[in-house]
C-alpha cells in the first residue's frame, strides 16, 4: 500500500510521520486490497484548541473511504480517523 502525507500550514515532525505510517499499515489487516492511503494534515484557523484536522482517504477498488477528524493534536485526530476507517 502506498502512503501519501500532505500538509497545509504545518510541517510534521518525524515521529508523527512514523506514527501515521504504522497506524495506516495496520489497516491492511482489515482491507487486503487497499491501493493507497492519503493523509492530509491541516491546522484550522480558529481560536479553539481542537484545531488539528486529519483527513484520511483510503483507496480501495470500487470505493474510497474518507474520514475527517479534528482534535487537540494530530495524534488524537489520527487515532480517531483510523478507528473510524476500520469500521
Question: What are the residue ranges of the model-derived segments?
Answer:
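N-terminal, polar/charged subdomain of small-to-medium soluble alpha/beta proteins
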Residues: 1-87
